């Protein structure tokens, strides 16, 4: 009985007493041998073409990953810089809007402040300048209107003067020729009357008188 138990407890061939599970050493030896065979095939160039393509693709993928990681990091840094610039510009814009609003508020509160500052700046050069009254401010406006009307009238008169004169002399000559006969006709009529007076004896009626009597 004791001999049979001792034989059963003895380790089998191919196992190690320190191994946790029987047969593990054989499996490790097989994997090591397969790895050695693969390395030898790779070194000798006897690997099939499909495996070579897979290895090349893995290498290319690793390179692309590294490149994309670099590009991604650069883009991230650029985007962060743009965001910071955008925030700074927004802050500056808000400050400018605040300044404009304050300036408008001050100008609305004191409308004559700008005029007073301008007069104060001109005083050392031209002496003290008194502000214009309401009547004095309106005078230049009316003066400007008068000047404009005067220029318009002058332009109209100049245009009328530049127009050609109407032929009045021709009308006067026609009227005078129609009313008064020429000098030659007058002389002829006077000579005829004198001849008639000489030809008719005294006591006889003139042809003009005969005509009147017959009428």
Curated annotation (Swiss-Prot):
Nucleus is among the record's keywords: yes
Alphabetic keyword roster: Coiled coil, Nucleus, Repressor, Transcription, Transcription regulation, Tumor suppressor
Coiled coil: 69-110
GO biological process entries: negative regulation of transcription by RNA polymerase II
Signal peptide residues on this chain, from the entry's feature table: none
Residue ranges, compositional bias (Basic and acidic residues): 7-19
GO molecular function: DNA-binding transcription factor binding; identical protein binding; transcription corepressor activity
Tissue distribution of the protein: Expressed in liver and testis. Expressed in the seminiferous tubules (at protein level).
Keyword Coiled coil appears in the UniProt entry: yes
GO cellular component, one term: nucleus
Polar residues composition-biased segments: 150-163
Source organism superkingdom: Eukaryota
Region (Leucine-zipper) residue spans: 75-96
Disordered: annotated span: 1-25, 150-215
Location(s), subcellular: Nucleus
Function comment: May be involved in transcriptional regulation. Has in vitro transcription inhibition activity. Acts as a tumor suppressor in hepatocellular carcinoma (HCC) cells.
Similarity section: Belongs to the TCP10 family.
Subunit structure: Self-associates (via leucine zipper). Interacts (via leucine zipper) with ZIPK/DAPK3 (via leucine zipper). Interacts with MAD4.
Record protein name field: T-complex protein 10A homolog 1
């Amino acid at each position: 009985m004791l001999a049979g138990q001792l034989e059963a407890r003895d380790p089998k061939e191919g196992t190690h007493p320190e191994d946790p599970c029987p047969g593990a050493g054989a499996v490790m030896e097989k994997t090591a041998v397969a790895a050695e065979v693969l390395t030898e095939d790779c070194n000798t160039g006897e690997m099939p073409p499909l495996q070579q393509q897979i290895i090349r693709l893995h290498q290319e993928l690793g390179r692309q990953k590294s490149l994309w990681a670099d590009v991604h990091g650069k883009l991230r840094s650029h985007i962060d810089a743009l965001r910071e610039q955008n925030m700074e510009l927004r802050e500056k814009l808000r400050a400018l809007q605040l300044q404009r609003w304050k300036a408008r508020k001050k100008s609305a509160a004191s409308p004559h402040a700008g005029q007073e500052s301008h007069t104060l700046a001109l005083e050392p050069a031209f002496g003290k300048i008194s502000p214009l009254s309401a009547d004095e401010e309106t005078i230049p406006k009316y003066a400007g209107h008068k000047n404009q009307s005067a220029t318009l009238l002058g332009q109209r008169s100049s245009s009328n003067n530049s127009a050609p004169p109407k032929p009045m002399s021709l009308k006067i000559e026609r009227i005078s020729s129609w009313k008064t006969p020429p000098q030659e006709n007058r002389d002829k009529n006077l000579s005829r009357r004198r001849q008639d007076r000489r030809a008719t004896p005294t006591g006889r009626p003139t042809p003009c008188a005969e005509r009147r009597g017959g009428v």
